[in-house]
Amino acid sequence: HLANTEKQKYLYDHMGWDVPEYIHYGRLKMEDIALSTSKAMAGIEDGTYSGWDDPRLGTLRAIARRGIDPRTIYNLITEIGVKMADSAISWKKIYGLNRNFLEPVANRYFFCEDPQLITVGGYEGGKVDIERPLHADHMDRGNRILPFDGSAYLAKSDINDGIFRLMDAVNVNIDGGEITYHSTSFEDARSVKARIIQWVPVDDNVDVKIVMDDASIKTGLGEGALRDLKVGDIVQFERVGFARLDEIADDELIFYFAHK
């Protein structure tokens, strides 16, 4: 580093030696993540980490497994450049750059963590097929079909008192755990400032596991259209975030979470 350079130069000048060329560069640091190879290896050996692609590590393998596009890292390093001082990288910056690449390619799907089966009392609309675009900005990709007959799975965290709109389906009133039909139109939902939440069909769903960036796991149900994916595909779970399909195990899809 610079201090040692001055000391070495003083010694070389004093001894009459040719002063070598000094090359200085700073270290790259990331917030709240392990970049030390020795510490990562020790953690892998003692079982703290599952491997070099554990989501808690800052290795290229780890961030690629989560769905961070290679162009994001290239653009980030190019923007930072070579500096003598250390540089700190924030996840907020990485996610912001990566979102530019994922947003146009990631199709949208529903996922409900810790799903709870609900039945809408007073609903008389019969069974209908709800069509929702895979991507609102790319209508040429087609629609997903979500069957609805008055029952659905909701994320446990979304079941609170108030008026809610099940996306593109119906508006419901939740009062003390009792769920009743309120109305159907989006205009009605907007007039009462209803919160809009995702849901998963009772008759067409698949088990989903999402490995988060801290290695914790979210489990739940996703819509049946997820079965059309292949390993490596990146999706956006509405109201949850971007995730990369890592493994298809029996009838369970295992994703790695990228970011919101």
Residue ranges: model-predicted function:
Residues 1-260:
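Catalytic adenosine-cofactor/nucleotide-binding cores of aminoacyl-tRNA synthetases and other
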